[in-house]
Amino acid sequence: MLKQKTLKDSFSLSGKGLHTGLDLTVTFNPAPDNHGYKIQRIDLEGQPTIDAVADNVTETTRGTVLSKNGVKVSTVEHGMAALYALGIDNCLIQVNGPEFPILDGSAQYYVQEIERVGTEEQSAVKDFYIIKSKIEFRDESTGSSIIVLPDENFSLNVLVSYDSTIIPNQFATLEDMHNFKDEVAASRTFVFVREIEPLLSAGLIKGGDLDNAIVIYERKMSQESYDKLADVMGVPHMDADQLGYINHKPLVWPNECARHKLLDVIGDLALIGKPIKGRIIATRPGHTINNKFARQMRKEIRLHEIQAPTYDCNREPVMDVNRIRELLPHRYPFQLVDKVIEMGASYIVGIKNITANEPFFQGHFPQEPVMPGVLQIEAMAQVGGLLVLNSVDEPERYSTYFMKIDGVKFRQKVVPGDTLLFRVELLAPIRRGISTMKGYAFVGEKVVCEAEFMAQIVKNK
């Protein structure tokens, strides 16, 4: 299984804040396992920390603003996108003001610094949320929508549509996060000339200029109005009849605006709190719908906190019944594992098919057959035993004996025709032949029982 990652070392970036115009420095630091993303305002008394999760987003007008107990940090999305796309799970971010510096309006400097300091693998397993069915969020008032579909990896398709002759419908896609650096990171934020005066009047974009945003002039205005706006922006006067991009830097890609919207989607969905395996299809996305979708995903995750393993009956098993018989001393009717379909250093997934011919159904119960709970635990324990035996050389010469079982819960009946899917994982490294494990049994997507085990590996006499 993939492990969590953090930075090998800290790095800092400095620049103007897009909306405040303040000189700001943000520092990204390594963080321990299961820390997640946290942002610390080191300029305030007590240096308060905000969890970087969608539930703490309070404003989305022209960027993503996180708030907690009156403490705010804005314009976080580009830094968050870089962390998420490069697979960083745990990071403490310190900033000396109310927003991240805008830099050049893209995520490329974050990516460069992450690559410079490097990343390191941690002990904890990366906790993916696997999309198993379509999830959709629509905003009928704007025509925006975000859909996520099952997929083996995280990928995105983004469509933007504006009432503009300069930016027609644009499409951007990212099939693999490994391509984020080359295909997305350098895409810059953008603004329409018609939006600049209202934004300035609202006290925003005080640090905006042609070096940190693409500025698009697509609706003709009078030369006088255009000259006044140029004076406010601090740029030379230009011909009001000449529509188009007014930046002195050329576009990185013809569809740079769509690519930047894709970057923003990644940054906002990083606030879900877990990496996703699924394909995102976003139509006319923006920070508002991105955040609403991220909140919906957090609710989905809470509802399905324990996910059943994926079972593909066409894949070759890791262990078939014959190999299991070589490792476990159990025999009919007490060999209760049919096959192992997945196994890593710290986890295992096994299967027991429940048929009407099971001998225990003769007495439990003849008129309403139900698999005894103690046998469900026995089957789970056998799967865990296979995991533990996998940690030693010549496993055929060892047996596993269980010393303690705790936290047993039965949630649903198991009946003939069910397929029991077991997932057992180590809670700590095996020490001196002693292991502690947590196991879940599923029928379909539902947890039917769970338990914790302590076991000892003993060499056979």
Curated annotation (Swiss-Prot):
GO terms for molecular function: (3R)-hydroxyacyl-[acyl-carrier-protein] dehydratase activity; metal ion binding; UDP-3-O-acyl-N-acetylglucosamine deacetylase activity. Residues 1-302 are annotated as: UDP-3-O-acyl-N-acetylglucosamine deacetylase. Keywords: Cytoplasm, Hydrolase, Lipid A biosynthesis, Lipid biosynthesis, Lipid metabolism, Lyase, Metal-binding, Multifunctional enzyme, Zinc. GO terms for cellular component: cytoplasm; membrane. Zn(2+) binds at H78, H260, D264. The keyword Hydrolase applies. Pathway: Glycolipid biosynthesis; lipid IV(A) biosynthesis; lipid IV(A) from (3R)-3-hydroxytetradecanoyl-[acyl-carrier-protein] and UDP-N-acetyl-alpha-D-glucosamine: step 2/6. Residues 303-461 are annotated as: 3-hydroxyacyl-[acyl-carrier-protein] dehydratase. It catalyses: a UDP-3-O-[(3R)-3-hydroxyacyl]-N-acetyl-alpha-D-glucosamine + H2O = a UDP-3-O-[(3R)-3-hydroxyacyl]-alpha-D-glucosamine + acetate; a (3R)-hydroxyacyl-[ACP] = a (2E)-enoyl-[ACP] + H2O. It comes from the Bacteria. The active site is at H287, H364. InterPro entries: FabA_FabZ, FabZ, HotDog_dom_sf, Ribosomal_Su5_D2-typ_SF, UDP-acyl_GlcNac_deAcase, UDP-acyl_GlcNac_deAcase_C, UDP-acyl_N-AcGlcN_deAcase_N. Its cofactor is Zn(2+). GO terms for biological process: fatty acid biosynthetic process; lipid A biosynthetic process. It is found in: Cytoplasm. The keyword Kinase does not apply. Its main location: cytoplasm. Its EC number is 3.5.1.108, 4.2.1.59. Pfam families: FabA, LpxC. PANTHER family: 3-HYDROXYACYL-[ACYL-CARRIER-PROTEIN] DEHYDRATASE. In the N-terminal section; belongs to the LpxC family. In the C-terminal section; belongs to the thioester dehydratase family. Catalyzes the hydrolysis of UDP-3-O-myristoyl-N-acetylglucosamine to form UDP-3-O-myristoylglucosamine and acetate, the committed step in lipid A biosynthesis. Involved in unsaturated fatty acids biosynthesis. Catalyzes the dehydration of short chain beta-hydroxyacyl-ACPs and long chain saturated and unsaturated beta-hydroxyacyl-ACPs. This is Bifunctional enzyme LpxC/FabZ. It comes from Bacteroides thetaiotaomicron (strain ATCC 29148 / DSM 2079 / JCM 5827 / CCUG 10774 / NCTC 10582 / VPI-5482 / E50). The lineage of its organism: Bacteria, Pseudomonadati, Bacteroidota, Bacteroidia, Bacteroidales.
